[in-house]
Amino acid sequence: MQILVVCRPVRDGDQTEFRRLVPAEGAALRELKESGVLSNAWTPGRPGAVLMLEVGTEDDAAAIAAALPLAAAGLITTEVIPLHPMDL
């Protein structure tokens, strides 16, 4: 199942802690990429990200997103969007 995850920084989040966790976030994303769970990732050119996950269920994606270091620290929100094929 393909899931889009939109990650946005929380308003008034601790920027020092955010910067401190960025390397751990990158490492976590690289691990997901190497395992085949993260198929692609994009940045809007500012803090935040859009991730494409390949997982079994929407709940799997939500758990993965919640476990990311910045999400676990309460410094980003994650919106999990299941994608479905379109008949064209």
Name each region found by the language model.
Residues 1-88:
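Conserved, structured core segments of small domains
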